[in-house]
Amino acid sequence: MPSYTVTVATGSQWFAGTDDYIYLSLVGSAGCSEKHLLDKPFYNDFERGAVDSYDVTVDEELGEIQLVRIEKRKYWLNDDWYLKYITLKTPHGDYIEFPCYRWITGDVEVVLRDGRAKLARDDQIHILKQHRRKELETRQKQYRWMEWNPGFPLSIDAKCHKDLPRDIQFDSEKGVDFVLNYSKAMENLFINRFMHMFQSSWNDFADFEKIFVKISNTISERVMNHWQEDLMFGYQFLNGCNPVLIRRCTELPEKLPVTTEMVECSLERQLSLEQEVQQGNIFIVDFELLDGIDANKTDPCTLQFLAAPICLLYKNLANKIVPIAIQLNQIPGDENPIFLPSDAKYDWLLAKIWVRSSDFHVHQTITHLLRTHLVSEVFGIAMYRQLPAVHPIFKLLVAHVRFTIAINTKAREQLICECGLFDKANATGGGGHVQMVQRAMKDLTYASLCFPEAIKARGMESKEDIPYYFYRDDGLLVWEAIRTFTAEVVDIYYEGDQVVEEDPELQDFVNDVYVYGMRGRKSSGFPKSVKSREQLSEYLTVVIFTASAQHAAVNFGQYDWCSWIPNAPPTMRAPPPTAKGVVTIEQIVDTLPDRGRSCWHLGAVWALSQFQENELFLGMYPEEHFIEKPVKEAMARFRKNLEAIVSVIAERNKKKQLPYYYLSPDRIPNSVAI
């Protein structure tokens, strides 16, 4: 009788093993085997991290094996099991791989396809078509869209982490408990001793150093020492944790009535301000989005304030970007003066602090939350709903949505919900952050997620004109490496544009993103369908780049740039100044966050800047969803390209007092998971 050798690999994460009964049956083109209990006498089967082998003898020839059925039945208590893969050695000596990489929970039957990626058109056998359809029907019941707030991209229909499908939950929920992590952060940073003085002001700038430990020889220390300097202020718009707002100014806005006479002491080329604009030396950052946003009112004991500044910047003869004019609100007038570097020291400093605070709010809520977290969740939900596990695009993307839906669900549960942690320290808490996302949706376009196009749209593409924009330089390298990789994978499975156009599952995936993620907005520019291999490759590059590189660029620098409180105040306790010549150091300190909010803020940016335990970085694919040699070779080339980028960035950083490493591929996690 024919005999098969079955190898079963159990996951190595905590509680991956099981004591439940595991049965296996084989489905072939010529018949189906009986159920076989996988059990070895005097042996503990399916332990965490184990690879177990079993001989399975069948009564008759089964033909080509098409499916493997796994049944899990309760032994004593339900015991979840994480199955990595099954391999089958046939009586003819052939090896067949059946990837799984998911949790098997309860008393269930799981059906596995072999690991070869297949488009829908490749499945001509009824049982395979049926399996494909049933998998998507089941997933669409599990992964349901929900509107968390009006106007937001839709998210997963789950009130809390434990409501999620087991496959997308964190291995340990404790590791992503925001309350626990923030408390741990404050303990690690030795700042919980200040919490009893929650609403008291600091005495002066030096007083902030009491909560600033463990920073020797770090970017944080450099920020603390140089934050008041105009060069450091300008540098952050290029290479800080929000390097996406600065744009070349092609015309001075009417709402900022700045003149040459006002700024001539800052201009170094003996040109008028208008001539500097024409020569491309003037840049602008406009926080119009914040105009009219409600400030946090959740604490009746502390008034909090927001501004909507406009900041004009200048490229000096050293090609460095420096601020030359700041107006703290959108409508010009006598009580909304334009602050200048030539003003009194504390006037100018407070104006810059207001800009830094506004930048913090836009960074946290729009650049970070909306444009990486929420967008990546949309891609993840659409993928699970519309692409079966056998689809090549599912196999390509699944690593890049790992834990994303889970981290966002935890954020909605603890962080950005009503009365959540975000409300404790941020002026945009208490609902302002919701208003911001609703406003910013109109600017969330497909083109703005295409990295090269986004850089060009802001007039920031020239390396000769703007030589110190490392976010742009490194981002373009990583974008091109991802684009090359996705193009290779697409070409393996789609031999022509027509195959792309005629792939119904792919088109449903793209349409789901448009309809539910972008809420069917034509102005978003998101495609409803893809019609060519080139377009598909670009689309996949957007998905992967957003989840990996873009998130890394705007997330992991938060402690570096935001931990020195005066450089990134999460709230301001007095309104913007309405006149010049009245600001004192005491007024600035009383405007900055109090001790308690400073501590909450510091704990938050520390916790958010940490990599996950056992982090998987860009190009690492330990779960082998693909088994075909051409794709594995493409992955190897991808990793080689990424290693070359790591070397280029490391070599440049050797010469820099202020290194930029957020887009070094060895520091870019595969997915949004923190």
From Swiss-Prot:
Binding site for Ca(2+) 1: G17, D79, D80
Pfam family, any one: Lipoxygenase
Residue ranges of domain Lipoxygenase in the record: 119-674
Superkingdom of origin organism: Eukaryota
PTM description: Serine phosphorylation by MAPKAPK2 is stimulated by arachidonic acid. Phosphorylation on Ser-524 by PKA has an inhibitory effect. Phosphorylation on Ser-272 prevents export from the nucleus. Phosphorylation at Ser-524 is stimulated by 8-bromo-3',5'-cyclic AMP or prostaglandin E2.
Cofactor(s) for this UniProt protein: Fe cation
GO MF annotations in UniProt: arachidonate 12(S)-lipoxygenase activity; arachidonate 5-lipoxygenase activity; arachidonate 8(S)-lipoxygenase activity; hydrolase activity; iron ion binding; oxidoreductase activity; oxidoreductase activity, acting on single donors with incorporation of molecular oxygen
EC numbers: 1.13.11.-, 1.13.11.34
Residue(s) at site: Essential for stabilizing binding to COTL1: W103
Keywords associated with the record: Calcium, Cytoplasm, Dioxygenase, Hydrolase, Iron, Leukotriene biosynthesis, Lipid metabolism, Membrane, Metal-binding, Nucleus, Oxidoreductase, Phosphoprotein
Documented activity regulation: Undergoes a sequential loss of the oxygenase and pseudoperoxidase activities which is dependent on the structural characteristics of the substrate for the reaction, on oxygen concentration and on exposure to phospholipids and calcium. 15-HETE and other 15-mono-hydroxyeicosanoids exhibit the highest inhibitory potencies in their capability of suppressing 5-lipoxygenation of arachidonic acid, whereas the other HETEs, (5S,15S)-dihydroxy-(6E,8Z,11Z,13E)-eicosatetraenoic acid (5,15-diHETE) as well as octadecanoids, are modest or poor inhibitors.
GO cellular component: cytosol; extracellular region; extracellular space; ficolin-1-rich granule lumen; nuclear envelope; nuclear envelope lumen; nuclear matrix; nuclear membrane
PTM sites of type Phosphoserine: S272, S524
Cofactor note: Binds 1 Fe cation per subunit.
Oligomer and partners: Homodimer. Interacts with ALOX5AP and LTC4S. Interacts with COTL1, the interaction is required for stability and efficient catalytic activity. Interacts with PIK3R1; this interaction bridges ALOX5 with CD40 after CD40 ligation in B cells and leads to the production of reactive oxygen species (ROS). Interacts (via PLAT domain) with DICER1 (via Dicer dsRNA-binding fold domain); this interaction enhances arachidonate 5-lipoxygenase activity and modifies the miRNA precursor processing activity of DICER1.
Family named by the database record: Belongs to the lipoxygenase family.
PANTHER family, A to Z: LIPOXYGENASE
Protein name, as recorded: Polyunsaturated fatty acid 5-lipoxygenase
Protein encoded by which gene: ALOX5
